[in-house]
């Protein structure tokens, strides 16, 4: 009915399986769009009113305050904690993030037209890294050689993750879909504390991944949760270095509370952020060449016709008529200077 009234594309709910999606695609001419990456809602799509009731912000209007990321207890009618003594975390309503890189070919084969990446309230570097990886993956499949470089998997994990799941795409995962121990970015494990320097607030870290100056770290301490720091200085064998490779040890400054054998997670990757920064901003903006035809005839409005490389056009005219100049007549240089004032748009004359 919607298609008969002009709807061209439908966005499917996240609760559908690939089999469901394929069935829908094969029974409609409407373009189908699906979510392929990012945050998941613990409720059926459109059915959660928690944010509206708790925070006065409607999730159905794109303003969800994510109360599902808060800690909760599961109690019986007598107030008894039903999960006491189990391995369940306290973030009982917090799902992992959706990641479909490994099953993307199945979605393409199912007939999906558009692939939706959840990025509400995310930083631009997140958008850049995730779109970069999925664009490359889709292009490789269409070229007949599907391949996702290991670096793309690592970049997506590093930029933001609550651990990953394919949600309902392949199966009904139950509790394994939940990130009940951590509701926000968990980062990537880069090493362990192997030595503490008493009285110096320094530690030696045995690295499992490359570490660079500017990286943000979290120590998952045995007592007190997590403490963080930024790597502003690190040494190897007494010499200052700007980066260090997996398998080596570095000495860095640490916050209070760090213990031996604590795991070290990187939550901010300075090199990855610099890479992502190349995808946006003025230097990275796509430039579209346009031709301009300016026409001025006495007694008529001055008109401007713009045409880009793909043949798209834009037309405008003044609300005054052209008159004979009293002092300085317009010449080509003056007209070009004015037309070339395209500001921060992506167009260039």
Regions found by a protein language model. Give the residues of each.
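Surface-exposed amphipathic alpha-helical tracts and adjacent flexible/coil segments at the periphery
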Residues: 3-349
């Amino acid at each position: 009915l919607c298609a008969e009234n002009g709807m061209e594309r439908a966005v499917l709910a996240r609760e559908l399986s690939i089999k469901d999606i394929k069935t829908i695609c094969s029974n409609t001419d409407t373009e189908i769009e699906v979510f392929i990456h990012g945050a998941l809602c613990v409720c059926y799509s459109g059915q959660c009113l928690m944010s509206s009731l708790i925070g006065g912000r409607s999730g159905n209007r794109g303003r969800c305050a994510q109360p599902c990321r808060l800690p909760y207890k599961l109690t019986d009618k007598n107030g008894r904690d039903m999960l006491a003594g189990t391995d369940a975390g306290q973030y009982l309503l917090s799902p992992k993030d959706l990641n479909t890189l490994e099953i993307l070919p199945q979605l393409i084969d199912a007939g999906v037209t558009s692939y939706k990446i959840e990025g509400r309230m995310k930083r631009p570097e997140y958008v850049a890294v995730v779109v970069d990886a999925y664009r490359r993956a889709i292009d490789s499949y269409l070229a007949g050689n599907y391949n996702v470089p290991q670096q793309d998997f690592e970049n997506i994990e590093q930029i933001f993750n609550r651990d990953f799941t394919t949600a309902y795409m392949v199966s009904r995962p139950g509790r394994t879909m939940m990130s009940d121990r951590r509701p926000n970015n968990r980062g990537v494990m880069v090493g362990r504390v192997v030595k503490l320097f008493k009285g110096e607030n320094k530690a030696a870290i045995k690295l499992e991944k490359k570490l660079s100056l500017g990286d943000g770290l979290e120590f998952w301490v045995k007592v007190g949760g997590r403490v963080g720091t930024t790597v502003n200085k690190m040494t190897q064998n007494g010499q200052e270095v700007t980066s260090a490779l997996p398998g080596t040890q570095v000495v860095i400054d640490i916050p209070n509370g760090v213990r031996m054998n604590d795991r070290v997670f990187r939550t901010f990757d300075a090199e990855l952020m610099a890479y992502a920064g190349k995808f946006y901003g003025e230097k990275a903006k796509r430039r579209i060449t346009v031709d301009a035809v300016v026409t001025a005839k006495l007694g008529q409005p001055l008109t401007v016709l713009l045409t880009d490389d793909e043949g798209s056009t834009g037309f405008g005219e003044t609300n005054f008529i052209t008159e004979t100049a009293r002092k300085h007549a317009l010449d080509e240089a003056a007209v070009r200077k004015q037309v070339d004032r395209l500001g921060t748009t992506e167009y260039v004359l």
